[in-house]
């Protein structure tokens, strides 16, 4: 189902940028968005949202043409920069002194950020990391089609940094007709492993696609997480049934809306199914435990182009002596060891070793070593 949708391709490294004088400096979020727009990760988007699409996405979770899209992908600039720009111009997109692309300006507009916060994040509380970032970024949005004119050279995980066209090819090569995507920003603990393997029972392959773009400061660093995924896959997963590749986007922490966004993006990478667990892409207590699953009832599988797989919170049951969920285990809470990425992070930062019911010992070793290194460099 998923590979039917056509991928946008806005990469052109021969594009002449020398004649273009004006430039917009991209922050890290806009830079990662530029790449994903150009390589088709954000298909059907061809650029940063214009006003009519932006308004439509914020209000209805759809583009102006009715296609499902739940997160506004925007290019914010300061009022000073906006005053120098005109609709119809072509402007360079730069970061760290390098020109990475161009935007053909179709729209310059001032968004209602409070409305965006309320509708996208369901809160205007600046303690929410997504809202905080929204308010910190400049106040004018520039919309228009983009071209990526230079690929990033400093990808921290080059062998795992694949474009959607490459992951699709990889799945095809492996003969996978059905592929389930799993999004994570945490090391994989036993609850994740249980969910992934349950899903793997009904599809041909698992696409483990950890997010390595900008996350909040107390999330475990991407390089440590990547090493933990490698050691886990090496020791506990069948090599011919799992594929690991990074998702270079920034984390929005938009809960339900981000769950839809993550599913649509994984469709572009070639997945037919997508795992949605408890509090997907949530943070703190801003969203209900299963709100990110309930939002999918607003859309048909046909219009999403990917099938969501919903999983309840899983735990280790000391009576069952196995991983389980309330769907499969009759025992009370007193017999359940509740696992979460937050809990694992907490234990590790306090110098405690999570028990084997929490995380595989090989993974724990990697995390302890990684966090010690982090403390030293701080």
From Swiss-Prot:
It is an enzyme of class 2 (transferase). It comes from the Bacteria. CDD domains: ATPS. Gene3D superfamilies: HUPs, Sulfate adenylyltransferase. Its EC number is 2.7.7.4. It catalyses: sulfate + ATP + H(+) = adenosine 5'-phosphosulfate + diphosphate. Keywords: ATP-binding, Nucleotide-binding, Nucleotidyltransferase, Transferase. Pathway: Sulfur metabolism; hydrogen sulfide biosynthesis; sulfite from sulfate: step 1/3. GO terms for biological process: hydrogen sulfide biosynthetic process; sulfate assimilation. Belongs to the sulfate adenylyltransferase family. NCBIfam families: PRK04149.1, sopT. HAMAP family: Sulf_adenylyltr. This is Sulfate adenylyltransferase. The gene is sat.
